[in-house]
């Protein structure tokens, strides 16, 4: 019998399972689909400290950036190549430079390496950048990873330590006795355990309800364009200053902001969009057109580059823009790890570490209270 069943084999569930198993906890991971086949597969692989205002999420991001080295070193050798690239990020503005410079200053005060550079320096970093740029901030700690490779490698580490990963197993409810979790009910039967981790991403709200611990997690749709393979053309993660505002917005309407980056395969990823439209997965041509238009505004050469494909997915959105990490006080033995929206790849290592620290009862490496389950925005109490 496992100690813990993690429901959800995306990057957050995989990171929690890996950290728990590294601490000696017996873990089983289940997913109704294939591992890393949901939200994780629709991500860009962003590991960013540059897009977050000072506060709890930035603190988690800084900790997670440090934790990546620890986690990657624990991976089995045969799956250790997750296309990790510490390429750095470049945020550019084409208007008044003061807002971007002010934002960078507040981040530096919070411990981020944020370097305001001149347009000439920006063009040296990215020669194909539009000459309309008026100011830029360079973030050497921004990085990129292949999200599916990362999640599957984390799960491979769980298996290597004796844990189990089961695909195609749908969790239905949590079984309790004397007020504590005793197992998780699935379509394939009951898996007995002492604790259950709800890592269901944008579906965490519905599973939380089924488990007796409802939480307010909503899906937020995002779309990405993928170009045909190209010679080296975009060297860093490059995005416009509007990206920060879009990340932190709670507006349900469509928002787009430019983020452009290359992959090891030579393709260029173009994002990003955010829209709260439930689980509507229809391809919206007007969204793709807007992404392309804005990307050309940053990198004019993209106007002549063919788009090979597009993909999108649903990201787990919490109304106060903070992840939910920790025990559910209403159901002893039920834990949650969700609500990271589009930042789950970058926040996964610190999330796994924090949940594990709380689970085994050691002092956490950062203050867990901002991410607690029983906060008003998540459980709807005042």
Language-model region placement:
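N-terminal Rossmann-like FAD-binding beta1-loop-alpha1 element of flavoenzymes
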Residues: 3-28
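C-terminal catalytic lobe of FAD-dependent flavoproteins
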Residues: 147, 280-282, 286-382
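Short hydrophobic core segments
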Residues: 5-7, 191-203, 207, 352
């Amino acid at each position: 019998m496992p100690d813990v069943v993690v429901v959800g084999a995306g990057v957050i569930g995989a990171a929690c399972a890996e950290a728990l198993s590294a601490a000696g906890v017996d873990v089983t991971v289940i997913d109704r689909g294939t591992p890393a086949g949901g939200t994780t597969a629709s991500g860009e692989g962003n590991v960013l400290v540059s897009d977050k205002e000072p506060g709890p999420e930035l603190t988690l991001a800084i900790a997670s950036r440090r934790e990546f080295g620890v986690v990657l070193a624990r991976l089995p050798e045969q799956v250790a190549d997750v296309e990790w690239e510490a390429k750095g990020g470049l945020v550019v503005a084409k208007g008044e430079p003061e807002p971007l410079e002010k934002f960078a200053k507040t981040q530096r005060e919070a411990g981020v390496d944020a370097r305001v550079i001149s347009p000439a320096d920006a063009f040296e970093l990215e020669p194909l950048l539009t000459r309309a740029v008026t100011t830029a901030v360079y973030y050497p700690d921004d990085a990129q990873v292949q999200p599916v490779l990362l999640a599957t490698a984390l799960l491979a580490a769980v298996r290597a330590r004796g844990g189990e990963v089961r695909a195609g197993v749908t969790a239905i409810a949590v079984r309790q006795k004397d007020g504590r979790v005793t197992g998780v009910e699935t379509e394939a039967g009951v898996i007995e355990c002492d604790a259950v981790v709800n890592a269901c991403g944008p579906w965490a709200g519905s599973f939380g309800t089924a488990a007796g611990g409802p939480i307010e997690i909503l899906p937020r749709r995002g779309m990405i364009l993928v170009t045909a393979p190209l010679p080296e053309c975009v060297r860093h993660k490059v995005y416009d200053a509007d990206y920060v505002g879009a990340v932190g917005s709670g507006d349900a309407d469509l928002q787009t902001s430019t983020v452009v980056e290359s992959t090891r395969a030579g393709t260029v990823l173009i994002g990003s969009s955010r829209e709260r439209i439930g689980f509507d997965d229809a391809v919206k041509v007007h969204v793709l057109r807007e992404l392309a238009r804005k990307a050309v505004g940053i990198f004019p050469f993209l106007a002549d580059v063919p788009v090979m494909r597009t993909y999108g997915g649903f990201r787990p959105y919490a109304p106060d823009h903070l992840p939910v990490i920790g025990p559910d006080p209403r159901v002893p033995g039920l834990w949650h790890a969700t609500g990271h929206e589009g930042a789950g790849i970058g926040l996964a290592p610190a999330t796994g570490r924090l949940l594990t620290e709380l689970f085994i009862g050691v002092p956490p490496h950062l203050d867990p209270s901002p991410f607690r389950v029983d906060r008003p925005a998540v459980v709807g109490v005042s």
